[in-house]
Amino acid sequence: DTIEARVLKRPQIYQPANASYHDKQPSAQASSQPAARPLDDTKILGTIVHQPIPFRKWAIFCLEKDVHHGEYLNDRFYELSEERRFDIYVDYGDIVELSNKSGIEAFKEAIDDYYLKYVCGKDANGRQLTKPRKTKDLYFFLIIMPDSIKQEHLYTALKNKINTDSPVISQFVSSKTIQKYNDRIYINILRQINAKLGGDLWRLNFGAEISRKTMLVGIDVCHKGKQSIIGFCATYDEHMCKYYTQASPQGQKGQEIISSGVLQEYFKSAFQAFRDHNQGQLPDHIFIYRDGVGDSMRAQVIAHELEQLTKIVQQEYCLDPSKEPALPKHTLIIVNKRVRQRFFQVGANAGISNP
């Protein structure tokens, strides 16, 4: 079958011209004169760091037998920074050494002690030693996972611990990964940390077809084990690189429809994040990608969740009764993994190609 359709222009990847953040300050020329390259130029994806974040205060946690790996990683991060491979400034991190017999609890205690001393300015007994610092002054923790502890258990326990009690970005690396002595691996680790700290790796130029005040929303319900978990993610900047995220358990296992209160609260918070970032303005177009919907529940989910979006939009966009509200357009896209149809573009000579 043949249908009429519109083929949008291929997006371009922005890359700052002559960018250099090595001196810890962004170049004015780099931010004001971005260059763009075609999206299919994949060679640049591994080298671009559009918004570098300087790594100043950070710490490595490892067993005594892995200290030399931590020292090597510390040196290599700094040397890669000096070589200006990707314009991220990396200072030397502290190395916190644990005995080789240490288990998960010992790692937790070491993280607690370091956070208490550096951020809170207290010793292990709670006595104030120095003036407290802000959490944001501590950039991230890097944990070298030893072979002697089951890595899945260590990762889960420490990730939950850090997120709950020590709100600091964390990165986990196995000792085997460091022993590969591959700069490409180390660069990827730095880029992952940069992204976790809020620095954009690359940005897309969407052209005039997409409004600068567009919010992109992803919603999924994951069913695993005894729980069903809601995942919610919404962009709030014009480049669609900054995200508001939330996750919470459903009321019962297998439940696909998200309750009214939860969904409205998520959208309300996402709109507030957009408002805070855009001088009080709200999106004029909302794209929603809804995943995790079975065929049997699709109609109910669409009807229920669109109704909740309409309600919260009416509340958020009609705050001033003296003004006529400019309600946003919204586009709902249901993600279906079981798709057999394929679409091709018909060329001038009746040849077909991917659009």
Regions found by a protein language model. Name each.
Residues D1-P355:
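Long, low-complexity, intrinsically disordered terminal regions
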